[in-house]
């Protein structure tokens, strides 16, 4: 009996131990699960904190990516760079001017107004004050002295021009007895109106285009301006004029630019959203797209074209670039991938921007942070590019310089990037993934000295559209959006080639471009032509 009792107790203890082990195992699993949950919550909280910090910086902070490195600060990247090329630091300081430290010379009044007409105003003594206060004799003017410069503005004024044309008759034929019925009449030639049955002129339509697409002034505000001048020009009338002239005149110049652009070997592209009302079978809130295609740094006159489409589908880019063969610099949009006969270059400014956005607030100079190190790698590449431009390198010299100086930096960057293990979902993880996913296209620029390190030129070219969009908000119709793309093209082409935008628009309208013009004739309307320069420079 005693033995059975002892065995029973042993079995009971074993069962108790097993139960305790199960409880411990369950508790351990629960603790591990809770730890994972807490860690996930912590990471989510950190990601949300970074997102709030990022959005706050975007909303209230500076948008510049420029940074000043602390003098004498040696960091991880500097060590790798010095090992790659020990002569690097000996070369750069003598040749690169740091913009932040360069003081601009003060501009004089003559510099400010060198392109503005001037005249003299003589202030004379009133007639009744020209008698000598001592003896009363009439005084004589013996000279004049300069007092000051004044800049004066004459507000815009409109006028109605009543156009007549003269008719000429041959007096001999009128009295001829041999041919009494063959009288000769000749009328002076008159250019056809800009718009049939309209009082619009190129100066008025050109001004409306200039105000909206250069100055960002919506048509409703222009309507108010015209009222102040006593002219009842409605926004609908102005819109119709712009659309008519863009489609019937400027489009022919636009198409010529398009043909010229596709003949280049180095292009850049960017795109942005635009809201367009009354698109067939589409909600007004649906995003439409404005594309910007431009020539690269090929040493030829710049060409910039805006292009409106309803969607961002890949075939739009393929259709617009049909016939182009060469290098295309873009942002990260995948729609540019696998375009025929095109080698894609990705933008290093975007890579730098991703790392910049991943830097915590107030930690811009904490060189132990991977995000700061990533920015430094990118900044060194841009330093090299500035150095090359300062040296006026040819395309071949720039290619060799990049292979000698920038390729070691790139190799160090990719090795460093492979060692990064950022937490999933963080801004640093996005920066690392963005660069890793585009490694091949980020290296393409090394192949040709004409290729650019960044897509900043196209981003700068599309910025006037994004600024103007904040004012006019939307296009009322697809036709209006397409016309806007054409006029924006003319405005940006004028600016890129150093022409006065209003003068260039009125010049184009005065020439009445049409589909019967040859490319040789359209070439004379291009902003780089001597004819356009003579008529449209300030």
Model-derived regions: residue spans:
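Catalytic center-proximal scaffold of phosphoryl-transfer enzymes
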Residues: 2-3, 129-130, 140, 167-169, ...
